[in-house]
Amino acid sequence: MLLITSAKYSSADFTLEFGKIMPSFLPLGNKRLYEYQAKLSKEKVVLSLPNNFKVNRCDLEKLEKLNIKLIFVEPNLSLGESILYCINALNINGNLSILHGDTFFSNLDLKEDSLCVSAVRENYEWA
């Protein structure tokens, strides 16, 4: 399973430009970031979102077409607490890959018991 953690709203930098939005909903080209993220895994994909976020109809249709399951999380949880909540709520017993909602990879070779690290070219306040 691929869990995309996107249960906090984006930082002020992005809010000024795109409005109150989650990192995985940021536009990239003519798509949402989650559309690229979902293609990184052949496994089931789950996207965590704040429980006070209303997903619009267009995005719901895209998410359904991509077979992305949504899980809604309290937005005031820390990243670790949010991940733990998702693991417990989804009853995950198999492999789990975690991708942060603001992360873009054109391709990614997800291996069991591994950690991927990437250099940051530009920095901003993390969600």
Predicted regions and their residues:
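Conserved core of the sugar-phosphate nucleotidyltransferase
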Residues: 57, 104-127
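Short, well-ordered beta-to-alpha junction loops that form the rim of enzyme active sites
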Residues: 100-102
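Glycine-rich, phosphate-binding/catalytic loops in enzymes
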Residues: 19-23, 113-116
